[in-house]
Design a protein with these regions (language model features):
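Structured beta-strand-rich core segments of catalytic domains in phosphoester-bond hydrolases
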Residues: 35-38, 42-110
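Short catalytic/ligand-binding loop motif for oxyanion handling, primarily in non-cytosolic enzymes
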Residues: 39-41, 64-65, 110-112, 149-159, ...
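Active-site beta-strand/loop signature of hydrolases that rely on acidic residues for catalysis
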Residues: 6-7, 22-40, 100, 130-152, ...
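Metal-dependent phosphoester-hydrolase catalytic domains
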Residues: 48, 76-79, 151-254
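Active-site-proximal beta-strand elements of phosphoester/diester hydrolases
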Residues: 1-10, 97-112, 143, 246
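A long, amphipathic alpha-helix that forms part
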Residues: 116-137
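N-terminal, active-site-proximal structural segment of metallo-dependent hydrolase catalytic domains
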Residues: 1-53, 60-65, 150
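Surface-exposed cleft-lining segments at the edges of enzyme active sites
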Residues: 81, 106-123, 159-163
């Protein structure tokens, strides 16, 4: 079973790229972030024509998430229960007995901003909900754009970016709290090349110079850890014309 995550930074713009990628990489499930489209304009017919069921949750201009699956999607949940939020950030569903949660974590803007306070509140709510989800669904995968680097290996310039957004002690502590619930960073279960990133700024030729961050993650539960066979970052879509600034991350379960 292969599952993937991709922040597409506008599905309207990137739909042809998503369909091309799925044709070349027919994963069993794919979660998308920053679809940036309302539900009435979501291209579900094109996705279904490609052989995928889909659950989606969007809004105009910002945010938006979707879960695509070759198998039926059941027990769909949108956003974190009991956490008041008008941002479309979370889509969850059960696929072939695996609970799949796709999430677009808040950016946070800057450590001294109101948006950072919101990010901390959101992360705490996610932690409480994930604990409940793991109890109900031992086989669980949480994946998406976390907007958090796990440690300095995930940062192109760890000295220059120390304590900036995505790299703060507070954000990393919240990431560790998710791990402590009984999940594992699938990418780090394997030896990986140094300076491996999933996001590169559009500016200053960042992709060409490999000045990026690893902020797109796949967490697998204890019950799935032994079945993880590979986890890779597919940089090819970042080379497309008019690409997303993120690229897909793919995990293979045996």
């Amino acid at each position: 079973m292969q599952l993937a995550t991709w922040n597409v930074n506008s599905l309207t713009v990137r739909l042809p790229q998503v369909l091309d990628w799925l044709a070349a990489n027919p994963v069993d499930a794919l979660v998308l972030q920053e679809t940036k489209t309302t539900d009435d304009k979501f291209p579900h017919e094109a996705i279904q024509a490609a052989g995928y069921h889909v659950a989606f949750f969007g809004q105009k201009t910002y945010n938006g998430v979707a879960l695509l699956s070759r198998s039926e999607i059941t027990e769909v949940v949108k956003n974190i229960p009991n956490f008041e939020d008008d941002m479309a950030r979370v889509i969850a569903g059960t696929v072939e007995g695996v609970r799949v949660i796709g999430a677009y974590f808040p950016n946070g803007q800057a450590p001294d901003s109101d948006k950072f306070v919101y990010k901390m509140r959101w992360l705490e709510a996610l932690q409480h909900w994930l604990r409940e989800e793991l109890q109900q669904h031992p086989k669980l995968v949480l994946m998406g754009d976390f907007n958090i680097t796990v440690d300095d290996r995930d940062v192109w310039d760890p000295v220059g970016l120390k304590d900036t957004i995505h790299c703060t002690v507070e954000e990393r502590a919240h990431f560790q709290a998710l791990i402590d619930l009984g999940t594992h960073d699938a990418y780090r279960l394997f030896e990986q090349a140094e300076k491996s990133f999933s996001w590169w700024d559009y500016r200053e030729f960042a992709f060409r110079r490999n000045r990026g961050l690893r902020i797109d993650h796949i967490l697998v539960s204890d019950a799935l850890k032994s079945s993880v066979q590979a986890c890779v970052i597919d940089k090819a879509p970042r080379k497309n014309e008019r690409p997303s600034d993120h690229t897909p991350v793919v995990v293979t379960l045996g």
